From Swiss-Prot:
EC number, UniProt record: 6.1.1.7, 6.-.-.-
Gene of this entry: Aars2
Pfam families documented for this protein: tRNA-synt_2c, tRNA_SAD
UniProt-recorded Gene Ontology molecular function terms: alanine-tRNA ligase activity; ATP binding; peptide lactyltransferase (ATP-dependent) activity; tRNA binding; zinc ion binding
Protein name: Alanine--tRNA ligase, mitochondrial
TM segment ranges: none
Compartmental location: Mitochondrion
Length: 980
């Protein structure tokens, strides 16, 4: 009822819109502003043609792990195109839609990052104007006429400046030319000379390797204006989704057709403002002016290539584009980080910093100062920019400052190192590697090479490649499955340390961190002295040289050594007084009270050196989040499974946590869901986490205290969530029965809110009685929930298709194949485990129903075909013929039906397939001679066709390939007659 009313209301709005005189989109003299161009597009489709205005989706894809960023206007509507939209959702009611979508193309399949700045058109962020018609609301004629009306009558583009293209067809796939679209353009008055046809590469759009697709028509603008040869740029692409690309490459017609159009706002504005470059429009000119005013560089002049002396204009374009991308992404919740989309954004920011400082000589804080200009130009269309402007500027400025500091330190290291080099010496690879380490200075290697090039020094690239390979091998060795190559102190080394009187390592500084009111953690540095050094082979040495991997013993450290299931810290150390040279620390191991740091020495290091240690904040925070989450998970399991539930082990790193629990069976779907809800409740309350060392004997007073079968130090550290440790130790306290209280030496959050969320993504039984759970937290957990929701919608859509019934076998097989694909996705996707179990149960039931439907259709088809064959072969003991069959299963059923209705007849049928293969099935009569077997009969025929056969004395089947079916049928008849 609601959908019908909405459709009626839409028709009424469109009728009113057509009856009202259309107002020009700009009454002001001069070229239109970019904002007016955007507004005119949206209002044209909304007010005149009854489209629903849908806000832009965030650039962070929702429930689509295949994308780093939203890179096209159609991304948010993929559930409609794929038929997976939730029928209860608002999107299910979309019929005709218009919007302006924020898009980012940097990383992944569509990556324009390295092209930005080099020419006058590429952008990492752009706006895609689009209108859509779903389910056949309208199609080619209306889409083309509306586009032509908007461009020529509203925007006022001269018709003689516009060219169009259409799909010329494809002989390989059997697709005919899209003459319908051609004729539409001709009927709209486009001269035949400006209506061009192209093949599938230019004018056939596909979503991916499989999925909806169809011919498209492009509208091009002639920059030359009829003077000389045309200079065409694509303006608008109108896609007519009417096909579906199957996994085998074949095309099927879609049950519902859709229109998907896209026109880049930046290019459209350039055309309407009479500019050759998008950077010359008012979408960018405020930014370019602000850059000029802040940097004092020569004004932007639009030069490229060799004409752009000093790469000044290139830098202008890079900075203007990248600050837009950064602002939009951060406003949408994507911040610079260390993996995935955040890592790409970090590259974008550092690329902008490089050009602004190295080329434009911009002052510190420059990039952050441009954020208000971005808000001014885009904020009216995307209010989230203004809402988050302070956050955006702060994050940009912080990362800019961090990178500038890294650059300054890097330059000093390079200067000092270069002074030591001879005239023909190469720059040491180990120093360059130290500069480029992710998480420390983080200077891209190409920038290191550029800085060296400016000094006339070449980098030891061969050595750098060796270090990269060595580091990759070492990281692989650090994996859980391969631990044997780690530096470690054996019993002899420990004895020697004791003999020399070297004290064990004081690692209490690892707990030296604070939580600020804004939610940020601060980790203090640690001053220490080198007490002992070990070579890569484990031999004690007095010093190590440049490029050597080594082990260090210090008198004290703030690094957490791997223990208690928590991965060790990473970071770096510097010699006191020589802050510029970083010694990367890959990990720390606890060996008999001594903490051995695994490091790479970029230059000489010796016993007695004073050093300062810095932990990798992001890595440490990741471990703290996962460790606190592990405690909450342990408590939630006890709340769900009972107070006697025991932990049997755990391991965590910044990416995920693993938890082994004693259970006789795997957790049920409801238990998994309950465990997560307990954790979410505590996280949502942002409870404080208390940590305190107490005498080991006192911990015996705590009823319900969680501890493992380990030897604990005395005093021991108690970690309590929401309840002060002193209160938990009280004689009458029941705190540990109602919250998480554990003995633990790990590093933890100071409040639970930073966990964000927890999702159990995997469950398996290690051995009888022990279940292993895998879990993730924070944004990863939220993403898993989004993917799970998206997959659930796809399964619901498949269920709906199954309920509607299949008209024919091909459709039934497609549905069965789709259910099989969903089953595979549900098995491997990173989604909540409880949801995986629910989906697998549903999909198993759907697959059974789909198979039943296929068997029913096959039986009906077999009955029909067998009756036709009996009419044609009413006499004689033999039926040898061809028949169309969708599969070998159908062909076998036809043969059996024939023999059931005529037991005295022997039957062999061949069925040619579109792929060129030939299916074969046969059955001999009940009274056939003992020498006449179905298997031998099928083998004789299939061998003739260059194939194979299998079966029994009574029934057999096979496959082959032949261009001469009559010859194959002749072979079948001759063999059978020889046996009768």
């Amino acid at each position: 009822m609601a959908v019908a009313l909405a459709a009626a209301a839409g028709k009424l709005r469109r009728a009113i819109g057509r009856s009202c005189p259309w107002q020009p989109f700009s009454t002001e003299p001069g070229p239109p502003h970019g904002a007016a161009v955007r507004d005119a597009f949206l209002s044209f489709f909304r007010d005149r043609h009854g489209h629903r205005l849908v806000p832009s989706a965030t650039v962070r894809p929702r429930g689509d792990p295949s994308l780093l960023f939203v890179n096209a206007g159609m991304n948010q509507f993929k559930p409609i195109f794929l038929g997976t939209v939730d029928p209860r959702s608002e999107m299910a009611g979309f019929r005709r839609v218009v919007n302006s979508q924020k898009c980012v193309r940097a990383g992944g399949r569509h990556n324009d990052l390295e092209d930005v700045g080099r020419d006058l058109s590429h952008h990492t962020f752009f706006e895609m104007l689009g209108n859509w018609a779903f389910g056949g609301e309208y199609f080619k004629e209306e889409a083309c006429s509306m586009a032509w009306e908007l461009l020529t009558q509203v925007y006022g583009i001269p018709e003689d400046r516009l060219w169009v293209s259409y799909f010329s067809g494809d002989s390989q796939t059997g697709l005919d030319p899209d003459l319908e679209t051609r004729d539409i353009w001709l009927s709209l008055g486009v001269p035949a000379s400006r209506v061009l046809s192209f093949g599938p590469q230019e004018n056939f759009w596909e979503m991916g390797d499989t999925g909806p697709c169809g011919p498209c028509t492009e509208i091009h603008y002639d920059l030359a204006g009829g003077v000389g040869s045309p200079q065409l740029v694509e303006l608008w692409n109108l896609v007519f989704m009417q096909h579906y690309r199957e996994a085998d490459g074949s095309l099927q017609l879609l049950p519902q057709r859709h229109v998907d159009t896209g026109m880049g706002l930046e290019r459209l504005v350039a055309v309407l403002q009479g500019k050759r470059s998008t950077y010359d429009t008012d979408l960018f000119s405020p930014l370019l002016d602000a850059i000029h005013q802040s940097c004092g560089a020569p004004p932007y002049s639009g030069r490229v290539g060799a004409a752009d002396e000093g790469r000044i204009d290139t830098a202008y374009r890079v900075v203007a584009d990248h600050i837009r991308t950064l602002s939009v992404c951060i406003a949408d919740g994507v911040s610079p980080g260390m993996s995935g989309a955040p890592l790409v954004l970090r590259r974008i920011l550092r690329r902008a910093v490089r050009y602004s400082t190295e080329v434009l000589q911009a002052p510190p804080g420059f990039l952050g100062s441009l954020v208000p200009v971005v808000v001014e130009t885009l904020g009216s269309a995307y209010p989230e920019l203004e809402k988050n402007s302070v956050k955006i500027a702060s994050l940009v400025s912080e990362d800019e400052a961090a990178f500038l500091a890294s650059l300054q330190r890097g330059r000093r290291i390079i200067d000092r190192t270069v002074k030591r080099l001879g005239p023909s010496d190469l720059f040491p690879a180990e120093v360059a590697w130290s500069l480029s380490l992710s998480g420390n200075l983080g200077i891209p290697l190409d920038l290191v090479e550029l800085m060296l090039e400016e000094k006339g020094v070449k980098l030891d690239t061969a050595g750098l490649e060796q270090l990269a390979q060595k580091e990759a091998q070492h990281r692989a060795q650090q994996a859980e499955a391969d631990q044997e190559d780690r530096l470690c102190l054996d019993v002899h080394a420990l004895e020697e340390l004791h003999r020399q009187g070297i004290p064990t390592t004081d690692d209490s500084p690892k707990y030296n961190y604070t939580l600020h009111p804004n939610g940020d953690y601060e980790f203090g540095l640690c001053e220490a002295r080198v007490l002992q050094l070990y070579s890569e082979t484990g031999t004690a040495v007095a010093s190590v040289g440049a490029g050597q991997r080594c082990g260090l013993l210090l008198d004290r450290t703030n690094f957490y050594a791997e223990q208690g299931g928590q991965a060790s810290d990473r970071g770096y150390l510097v010699r006191t007084g020589q802050q510029d040279m970083l010694f990367p620390v890959a990990g720390a191991q606890l060996c008999g009270g001594f903490i051995l740091h695994e490091a790479m020495a970029p230059e000489r290091l010796q016993v007695g050196d004073q050093v300062q240690l810095y932990v990798d904040k992001a890595w440490r925070m990741g471990c703290m989040v996962k460790h606190t989450a592990t405690h909450l998970l342990s408590w939630a399991l006890r709340q769900t499974l009972g107070p006697t539930t025991e932990q049997r082990g755990s391991h965590l790193n910044p990416e995920r946590l693993r938890f082994d629990v004693a259970t006789q069976t795997l957790l049920t779907t409801e238990q998994l869901r309950t465990v997560e809800s307990y954790v979410q409740e505590v996280v949502g309350q942002d409870k404080p986490v208390f940590m305190e060392e107490v005498p080991l004997a006192h911990t015996a007073r705590i009823p319900g205290l969680r501890s493992l079968d380990e030897v604990y130090p005395d005093p021991v550290r108690v970690v309590s969530v929401g309840v002060p440790v002193a209160h938990a130790l009280g004689p009458a306290s029941q705190a540990a029965m109602h919250t998480s209280v554990e003995l633990c030496c790990g590093t933890h959050l100071l409040s639970t809110g930073a966990v964000g969320d927890l999702v159990i993504i995997g469950e398996r039984q290690l051995v009888k009685g022990i279940t292993r759970l895998l879990a993730i937290t924070g944004e990863q957990a939220q993403q898993a929930r989004e993917v799970g929701q998206s997959l659930s919608q796809e399964v619901e859509a498949a269920s709906e298709r199954l309920s509607q019934g299949s008209r024919d076998l091909p459709e039934a097989h497609r549905l069965s194949k789709d259910i099989g694909r969903l089953t595979e996705v549900a098995e491997s996707a990173v989604i909540p485990q409880w949801q995986r179990q629910e989906l697998q149960t549903t999909l198993k039931m759907l697959q059974r129903r789909a198979n039943t439907a296929i068997r029913k259709l096959e039986k009906g088809q077999a009955t029909e075909k067998s009756q036709e064959l009996l009419k044609r072969h009413s006499e004689g003991p033999l039926i040898v013929d061809t028949v169309s069959a969708e599969s070998l299963s159908v062909l076998v059923k036809v043969v059996r039906q024939l023999c059931k209705q005529a037991p005295s007849i022997s039957v062999l049928l061949l069925s040619p397939q579109p792929t060129g293969s030939v299916l074969c099935a046969c059955q001999v009569a009940q009274d056939a001679t003992p020498t006449f077997t179905a298997e031998a009969w099928a083998l004789a025929v299939c061998s003739h066709m260059g194939g194979k056969a299998w079966g029994s004395r009574v029934v057999a089947q096979g496959t082959g390939h032949t261009a001469d079916l009559e010859a194959a049928l002749g072979t079948a008849r001759a063999y059978a007659l020889s046996q009768l």
